[in-house]
Regions:
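Short, solvent-exposed beta-strand-to-loop segments that form ligand-recognition rims
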Residues: 623-642
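Localized edge beta-strand/strand-to-loop motifs within extracellular or lumenal beta-rich domains
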Residues: 606-620
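N-terminal catalytic cores of secreted or lumenal carbohydrate-active enzymes
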Residues: 29-173, 178, 187, 191, ...
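C-terminal beta-sandwich/jelly-roll accessory domains of carbohydrate-active enzymes
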Residues: 383-492, 496, 500, 514-516, ...
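Secretory/extracellular carbohydrate-interaction modules
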Residues: 511-581
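Carbohydrate-binding surface patches
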Residues: 356-404
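Extracellular glycan-recognition/adhesion modules and their associated mucin-like linkers
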Residues: 662-685, 701-728, 744-770, 786-790
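Aromatic/acidic polysaccharide-binding cleft in carbohydrate-active enzymes
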Residues: 266-344, 348-362
Length: 790
């Protein structure tokens, strides 16, 4: 039932049998006493966050069996990440990082408990692991709440109605957070919430105060002087207690916070790539307890299920951004969590005397030990992320714990070979409670008396493009659902009965007022499609329910991480009075009107057809089959499509169609000499970032589209660029905003070389290892200058 990890450099033996030679010279031995009688706090779990927001969006659109496989890797015990806590966003119709999630109550008196995908996700998690703990937290809220004031009586009722929706879905919510995520908290309202929960049958729901930005433990200070607030608060929490986007080497918490005696959580961590975040996670999960007595650790986010042009496109435990192909990739981050989650359970106890830093030195690594409260079972999790040599660990078990056989599981986090991740490497029978093992640098180990662990075997199909033509008439959806592949960026675009006498189902923007935002508030819009789409026309039937405007978007690419209104895109905007414009936006939100005019008024409650076409640098806007205007602009060569409205406009859309052919030639570029891929380091979207080699991982920063204009696009809006338009050997290959310049044009040749149109030089790396920089080079015929598209 267990898989053995090939090439794992662990030596584990009974002390009496002698020590097996390790693969590297060991440092001085570290002695660890596993004492079941040690004091320690109660473990609450390791989990992840779905929300903040839209990052799980495409998961629900996956076909079976891939959707079920992904869910198994996330939630099924003994299979993958085996999450113990799932925190979800209480949708607020507003963008909360990577998109907007719909509210269960768009306006006062409204209630629909089937909107969005978080209910479905919680149901799927519970079906696989009935013991998983569920947490609810709002990032933003509909504008009717308190007439724009977050902490209000309206908010109390809003929370209660959300819990009622959970009950309709057969879900019991374990925790609610009494704050607006990372924005604001209120001691008085927390007391109001606690009283309301008790009065309405939810006394078992625990209240979390905090979820604040790093270093902000304001609620902890407040409870020291406010008895009612203290009594209303079950958990104090904070975000990124080990540092934001950090290696998570230190996770300090003020002594005064620990001294409150309250349960402490590190309730959001990570924000890192689904593979590259594994080492920080390995450190942080142990060190939040060692340094700060925090008993829960949540990774943001759960899954990277959004398209590569959206902020944080590869952050999560699994990459799942292609429901049209079924492709997914389980990251090293998932296995880093599994080393704790598959060997413990909420309610276990930390053993403080059996936890610490190897040899008393942080650089050697850390270890924590937890025990079952009802049996003699225990698990010790050891990480050696920063160690420079092998270390011998001498362990001695005492204090009523099992002295029976222990099982060793290991992951080599220095390796990108999936075979080196989460393997069962040894079984040890202690002698008199004593045993030893040798821990190698850069590894994560679990030493346990438990059984039942496993590594999932489901495999992903190959990647594939979403090709043209594409269309959706929206018929066949249930009311209140999000149309397939359509991702809300602001507002709430959901299926509804069509108006003005039209039969069937349409998509309606249903948020009728400005929200209480989390990010900058902008007009509602939603996106769909392939960032490589280039030559196409997007068409949609539109109906304005009241005075305002609607819009079509095209060639939509990168988006600013802090402002969803700052996006590379073209727009056709038209109002009920007939005023229209073709506009260009960018990631600095510099909106340029390329052409404008006035057409026959659209009016309200009548259907019209809008079209926005792209052919090379020619952009054509049409209304009801008549051309409104044509412009020439080559700023953005490719991108997605979208629909949108003015703020508060509850417009309808039907018969969305994108006509054209192909989806662009999108693939990784695999170097023939190294088998590594052309990569934008750290998923950067910053102009001037030099590309390099990296192990192929399917991330959006490795997906290159060769356009008909000979550009190599990444993220749908950045072009591979010969820096400074230089034609000299040694010129850095970088990413830059697309300009249509010849220094951004490339020939993909039959012999596998890629040559610059302006320079004639070959694209080549400065080595074969990870991070080898890529430059223009004199062509030599070497395999190092040849690339395979796959």
């Amino acid at each position: 039932m267990f898989r053995t990890l090939p090439r794992m450099l662990v030596a584990a033996v009974v002390l009496a049998a002698g020590v097996v030679a390790a693969a590297a010279p060991a440092e001085a031995a570290t002695s660890i006493t596993i004492n079941g009688g040690s004091a320690g706090r109660t473990f609450d779990g390791v989990g992840a966050v779905s929300g903040g927001g839209g990052n799980s969006r495409l998961l629900i659109d996956y076909p079976e069996p891939q959707r079920g496989q992904i869910l198994d890797y996330l939630f099924k015990p003994g299979y993958g990440a085996a999450l113990q806590i799932l925190k979800v966003e209480m949708g607020g119709d507003t963008n909360s990082t990577s998109g907007a999630e719909p509210s269960h109550a768009h306006f006062r008196g409204d209630l629909d408990c089937n909107r969005g995908y978080e209910w479905w996700l919680m149901e799927q998690a519970k079906a696989r692991n009935p013991g998983i703990k569920l947490v609810g937290l709002p990032w933003g809220a509909p504008g009717w709440i308190g007439n724009g004031t977050f902490f209000s009586d309206d908010l109390t009722g809003y929370y209660l109605s959300w819990l009622g929706c959970a009950k309709q879905h057969g879900l019991t919510i374990d925790y609610l957070t009494s704050v607006q995520n990372e924005k604001q908290w209120s001691a008085d309202w927390t007391v109001t919430l606690r009283n309301a929960l008790n009065a309405n049958g939810y006394s078992a729901v625990k209240v979390i105060s905090g979820d604040s930005w790093p270093g902000d433990w304001g609620p902890a200070s407040a409870i020291s002087t406010n008895t009612a607030y203290r009594n209303a608060t079950d958990v104090l929490s904070a975000h990124y207690t080990c540092g934001y986007l950090s290696a998570q080497t230190s996770c300090s918490v003020p002594a005064s916070v620990i001294g409150t005696g309250k349960t402490l959580w590190s309730s959001e961590n990570g924000s890192q790539d689904y593979n590259d975040g594994a080492k920080p996670l390995a450190r942080g999960i142990n060190r939040v307890y060692l340094d700060g007595k925090m008993t829960a650790y949540l990774n943001w986010d759960l899954i990277a299920a959004t398209t590569p042009n959206i902020p944080w496109p590869t952050v999560g435990l699994i990459l799942a951004n292609q429901p049209w192909s079924g492709f997914y990739s389980v990251g090293k981050d998932a296995w880093a969590l599994a080393h704790t989650t598959q060997f413990t359970a909420p309610g276990w106890k930390y053993l403080d005397a059996s936890s610490g830093y190897l040899g008393g030195n942080r650089a050697n690594g850390s270890y924590v030990t937890l025990r079952s409260p009802s049996t003699g079972d225990y698990s010790t999790i050891v990480e050696t992320m920063d160690a420079t040599a092998a270390q011998t660990l001498n362990l001695n078990v005492t204090g009523g714990l099992s002295t029976g056989q222990v099982h060793v599981w290991a992951t080599n986090l220095n390796s990108n070979n999936p075979a080196d991740h989460f393997g069962h490497t040894a079984d040890i029978t202690p002698s008199g409670g004593a045993f030893s093992l040798t821990a190698q640098p850069g590894y994560l180990y679990t030493i346990t008396t438990t059984t039942g662990q496993g590594k999932g075997t489901a495999a992903s199909p190959a990647q594939g493009s979403l090709n043209l033509p594409y269309s959706d008439d929206f018929d066949g959806y249930a009311k209140g659902k999000e149309a397939k592949y359509l991702m809300d960026m602001e507002g709430a675009f959901e299926t509804s009965a069509c108006g003005a006498g039209r039969s069937g189902t349409c998509v309606r923007q249903a948020a009728p007022q400005k929200t209480i935002p989390w990010k900058k508030f902008v007009d509602p819009y939603a996106l769909l499609g392939n960032v490589a789409w280039s030559t196409y026309t997007v068409n949609a039937d539109v109906l304005l329910e009241k005075p305002g405007s609607v819009q079509l978007l095209g060639r939509v690419g990168s988006q600013d991480t802090g402002n969803q209104g700052a996006v590379n895109a073209y727009y056709l905007r038209i109002s009920d009075a007939g005023a229209w414009s073709i506009q260009r936006n960018n990631t600095s939100q510099q909106v340029t009107t390329l052409r404008s005019g006035t057409a026959t008024a659209l009016g309200t409650n009548s259907w019209h057809k809008l079209s926005l076409g792209f052919s090379g640098s020619t952009i054509t806007a049409s209304l009801d089959g008549a051309v409104l205007g044509t412009v020439t602009d080559s700023t953005f060569p490719a991108g997605q499509v979208g629909i949108g409205t003015s703020t508060g406009e509850t417009a309808q859309f039907d018969n969305l169609a994108v006509t054209g052919s192909g989806g662009g030639s999108t693939s990784v570029l695999r170097n023939a000499a190294s088998s590594r891929c052309l990569d934008v380091p750290n998923v950067s979207q910053t102009n001037g970032t030099q590309v390099a080699l990296w192990d192929c991982n399917g991330g959006g920063n490795q997906q290159w589209t060769l356009t008909s204009g000979k550009q190599l696009l990444v993220y749908g809006a950045k072009c591979l660029d010969a820096e400074g338009a230089s034609t000299s050997a040694g010129t850095r290959a970088i990413i830059w905003d697309c300009t249509a310049g010849t220094n951004q044009q490339w020939n993909a040749n039959a012999d596998g070389t890629i040559t610059g149109v302006a320079s004639g030089l070959c694209l080549g790396p400065g080595g074969t290892g990870n991070s080898a920089p890529v430059t223009l080079q004199a062509c030599t015929g070497s395999s190092a200058q040849k690339w395979a598209r796959s």
